[in-house]
């Protein structure tokens, strides 16, 4: 066994010891401990790394776990913003799971590290009961692609999905802005860009597979309107989305 494999086994053992202690301390903890044993065995069978999400000292194991997705992980003050969102989720009675919360196992290459991050994030989504996704346009006119994947993952898993954006202008409006207003309707009434490529024109916040996919499942996409210099730090829309999620998850 190499050093990385030994480190993974030690990490798994420490997490199981922590969960066992919580199970002993809390009346309803044994069900949660059994749940994690099943997940560990599943991971072993698939040769995947076992991850148990952080559990507060005093927790209710019936608390809904919500995966907080968004491009905040790329910000220079990522830890600050992620911690603020997590604190708000806890105050609302939810247990937050967020990319960046857990240590990534050691790898030997960038490609392996990318795969390890993907595995950890997907494991958290499997453990989560719902998702709140930040669909604020990122590095372009559309939502962060990683967040879009995570939203689709949770939709496909049949779990409750909620989202918000800090940009009020809809998708077609942002495409128009990208081309300096040079979009127009053709003879058949289809909106097209200067290259003749059709533009989605449904009045939605983003691609219809995201916005409509959320609403078809009973979720909501909250539309905020943050200042340009606070697109990824303004949490007003997140708070509104969080309140809706709490109500619907009861």
Located regions from the model:
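Short linear/disordered segments characteristic of secreted peptide precursors
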Residues: 8, 26-31, 44-46
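Conserved catalytic or regulatory cores that recognize and/or transform ribose-phosphate-containing ligands
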Residues: 56-250
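Hydrophobic, low-acid, alpha-helix-prone terminal segments
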Residues: 6-17, 27
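Aromatic (phenylalanine/tyrosine) cluster motif
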Residues: 33, 49-50, 57, 61
């Amino acid at each position: 066994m190499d050093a990385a494999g030994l480190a993974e086994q030690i990490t798994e053992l420490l997490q199981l010891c922590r969960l066992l202690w919580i199970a002993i301390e809390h009346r309803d903890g044994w069900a949660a401990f059994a749940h994690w044993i099943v997940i560990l065995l599943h991971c072993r069978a698939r040769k995947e790394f076992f991850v148990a999400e952080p559990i507060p000292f005093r927790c209710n194991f019936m608390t809904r776990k919500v995966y907080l997705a968004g491009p905040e992980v790329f910000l220079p003050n990522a830890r600050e913003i992620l911690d603020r969102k997590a604190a708000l989720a806890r105050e609302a009675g939810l247990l937050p799971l967020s990319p960046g919360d857990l240590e990534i196992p050691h790898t030997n290459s960038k490609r392996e590290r990318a795969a390890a991050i993907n595995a950890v994030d997907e494991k958290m989504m499997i453990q989560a009961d719902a998702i709140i996704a930040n669909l604020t346009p990122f590095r372009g006119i559309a939502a962060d692609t990683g967040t879009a994947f995570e939203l689709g993952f949770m939709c496909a898993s049949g779990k409750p999905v909620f989202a918000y954006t800090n940009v009020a202008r809809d998708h077609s409006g942002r495409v128009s802005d990208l081309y300096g207003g040079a979009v127009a309707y053709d003879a058949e009434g289809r909106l097209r860009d200067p290259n003749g490529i059709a533009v989605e024109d449904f009045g939605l916040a983003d691609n219809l597979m995201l916005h409509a996919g959320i609403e078809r499942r009973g979720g909501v996409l909250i539309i905020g309107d943050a200042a340009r210099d606070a697109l990824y730090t303004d949490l007003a829309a997140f708070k509104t989305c969080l309140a809706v999620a709490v109500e619907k998850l009861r």
